[in-house]
Amino acid sequence: MSEHIDIWLVGNTGLRNPNRIQEGFSVFASSSFVGKLHGRENELGFMRLLDEKGIIQNEDGKDVSGSHARKWRLMFAKNGFIYPQVKKKDGQQEDLGRLDDITPFGRAFLNADTYAAVQECFLRAMSVEQFPLPDGEHYFSPLRWLLAIMLELEKRTGSSELSRIEFALWGHTTNPSYDLESVVDNILDLRQRRAVAPAKRAFDKKEIAKRGENYDKKSDNFLDYSDMNMRYLRISGVLQRKGRGLIIVPTKHILAEKLAKVTASKGPIIEQYRLLCSGAPLPTDNVDVAKALLDDLMKQMKDRHILFDITDLPLDTAAEINIARRRLENTLAQTDEIQYAKDQCNQWQEIRDYMSLIIKGGGKLVYDEDNAIEVPKDEMPAYLEWILWRAALAIDHMVNEPYEVRGFKLDSDFLPVSAAGGGKGDLYCEFEDFAILTEVTMSTSSRQEAMEGEPVRRHVSDAVLKYDKPVYGMFIAVHIDTNTAETFRHGIWYTKDDKKQRLDIVPLTLAQFQKYFVAMFEANKADPILLRSLIVKCESRRGILESPAWKQYIDEVVAEKSQKLVNRLPDQKHRIAPLIPAGAIVNDVCWGNGQVVALIANFPECNKTCVELPYLMSLPDEVSRCADGQTLLHDRFGEGTISGYVVVFKNKILTLNYPDSFIKGTLNMV
């Protein structure tokens, strides 16, 4: 009988990121839909709730059937967080639990407050044998089957690595009804033939077409489902990325060996459901296995000369041993993150490419068949924080550790799990003589100011009080709303004791930041001092420009400074006339201190040669200043140029030419 291929799905293509499940499940757990997720009205209602809470984006009411809710329900049930539906042939629903009600394991999942705890929940769920074999009588665990394949590969080749195309053709298309050795034979044959193929893409396409002859759905599914399946399998914590494929996590090798299984279970599915909903046991629940895993981890850390100390922890029970192991895993993760941070200066081009994807609205960039980057459209907020964190690491010279800079969580592949929570800034970069607090948002509408204006200023204010050094704020978004720029242009904040602060916050588009970031690396001059100089220059005219002009000025400064870096041009050394704020105090070597009360401007369209405008408090409402600081726009007279300022000294009122009087060295701003 010919082979009939059936691709198993540990996840769902409508919910490609398992890291979002806990957030959605938390919304569900506090809703009126607990125990009521079936039926059109409930599905539509829960979908609307997910949309309202920002968990999904049901653009323009695109989904009117409630399919979003069904996809989330499927993932809740498949992982044992709610009671799944029991078919009549398999038993009675009441023997398991009320349909769609939260299970004891679901409660444990809600209480998982670390990423390691979340991973363990998924690992317990994926270890359950609940996927039917073609005979309809046996059930298997895709994770355990795949681990068996990878361990056999390691036995033969020395590495458990499984590439994307290998997983696509011989990973999720097989199960324990196949012979393990034959599957690995096919993988190694594919690997050998592909290694000598001159055109990898054409080779892969041909192999997919050949394997697809025994598959009755779209052949695109081989690769499309691969990416989703591998992402779900990685959240178990036992597997991690290797290129676009998978490899067993070195510190979890013993656990992988204990979990691997080449046979299927013949027990009734309702028994597997009971196991699933109560929290399936893991090998690490056994003292001996837990101790073996801990000993192996300590050996690996000693081999890498990583210091650790767990002498203060009891090691009598499996739970205590696992607590000690998690402490060491955290130390190891921090050490790996420091190494990752050191390498970011060599990854600036990839960082640039990620920024480009975010600016475009997400998507994928394929370098070659084995290397690609992707920004999922529904994860752009997390990826924006993440890529700016990587940019900061690439610029380097920080005195705080990389894991102290960020507020968001990372997975074992250093990819973002979710955006940072509220209550603090996004990225805290502390340098020797100053600190930069970076805040980011994907919001682009006029709501941007309402959402970000207050928290960003509060976070920068808190940082000013915390650090005994200058603090600069960078607000980065794909688009900067003018109302947001206006809030940061003033930058006023009052502390709890009513102390007034004028905060230094510069709004930059992601494209502007990207331009300057790339220029620094192309010029081989990546340095936080240059970033500070950009911020200082951008904010230099905020006091005299209206927000539209200030945004334009920022764009001009970024372009000018980027060009100078790329062309290796030094900054101008000649004196530049200062920008004169309304009511400014100036000092003249002859007349002493004086105050600006008016300005003189030339408007070609006006009958008068010169027009005097009051300038003690601000420009008149009918006049605005352009980004260059010297050009004015008058509602009636059109465009004009500042040619002088009227200054009141103690015994004299003088009209001083601009810019000449302000660059000859006898007159200074006070």
Question: Which role fits each region the language model picked out?
Answer:
Residues 587-622, 627, 635, 643-670:
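Basic/aromatic-rich interaction segments and small domains that mediate binding to polyanionic partners
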Residues 424, 435, 639, 662-666:
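Short, mixed charged/polar active-site loops
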Residues 548-577, 639-644, 648-653, 658-660:
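C-terminal, charge/polar-rich interaction regions
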Residues 319-566:
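Catalytic core segments in nucleotide and nucleic-acid processing enzymes
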Residues 1-331:
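Donor-sugar nucleotide-binding helix/loop cap in glycosyltransferases
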